[in-house]
Amino acid sequence: MKYFILAQILFLTCLVGFAQQVMLADSITKNPVSYATVYDAKGNVIGRSDMGGYVNLQKGHEYHISHIGYAAKSFVYNDESIIFLSPSSYIIPGVKVTAKKKKYYHCKVFFRSIEHVDSCLKYYMDGIREFYIDTKSKKVHCGNVVTNYFMSKRKDIAQKKRSMMIGDKYMALPFPDKNTLYEETMRDKKRNIESGIVYADSISIGSCEVYPDKNEMLLSIDALWPRNALVTNLFGYTQVLSKHNKTELYRCDEFHAPSVFNLKSANSYRHLTLTHKKENIVRDIDVEDVFYVVEFKYTDTKELSSSNVLQEDYKKYSGMFPVIERIREQLVREE
């Protein structure tokens, strides 16, 4: 009898620690939310929801969810089969387009780039950057930028000695592509959007959600398709890019396809593995880059913003798009 009781206790203990598959869904449409980033109580990245919105969570554990199209959510998982996320909304202070077409589209973006190494937070960067985009050619011209660099306070992460000479910083400054994901999708004869699903050669590679009440569109794709991985070899090092997800949020209407001039925010997530053929070292690296368009106007001249103006913009907009506290409290400014 005592062995039976012991077996039951062990069984229940295993259940408590067992990761359960949970769907992340839109609180209004009830549709799955793909490519949301999930952090644990320490701010370590534990994964991303897949194209079906699924992610593995453990009962009784604290989690934090981040997605450019939804309000951040923090909670303790209690055995729910669906976790609902509320769509976020922010208004961009923009200047209306006049009858005369201007030469440039001038926009400012608030951005952040977060890098985890072996699931632990290591590097963080954020700031404000401005762009001038030619309204005819859509060529992107970079303006001024204000950037802040941070790294982990943890000495075992920040000060870890590496025998590998190659750097492990994969963070990147924001730079909008000439064409949006939507435009690239519609131009590719192998791709199409049907019933909210992005298909490539009849294979589901992403999702497309339209919000008529907000005149917005959210498009997410697997940017690696048709590859399963991208392998790069250099000086004995092997870098494997095994995940690359992209998401873009647009202001849209029924008359125009979403272009770079309608882009509201963008997210790019990469998972890489770094190894060396002569060293017994493996680095798992997760990098998430995100930016939000916070101001825009159309103009005929390129008048770059001063450093003081961008610093004030940073103070204003970093409060609008705060990073989760579990990440912020781990950071120290990089010297």
PLM regions with names:
Residues 64-76:
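A short, solvent-exposed loop/turn motif at the edges and junctions
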Residues 44-52:
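Short, acidic Ser/Thr/Gly-rich low-complexity loop/linker segments typical of extracellular
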Residues 20-29, 53, 95:
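A short, amphipathic beta-strand motif
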Residues 28-42:
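Short, ordered, surface-exposed loop/turn motifs in non-cytosolic proteins
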Residues 30-33, 54-62:
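Short Pro-Gly-centered beta-turn/loop motif in secreted/extracellular proteins
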Residues 82-335:
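Surface-exposed, low-complexity/disordered segments
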Residues 1-23:
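Bacterial Sec-dependent N-terminal signal peptides
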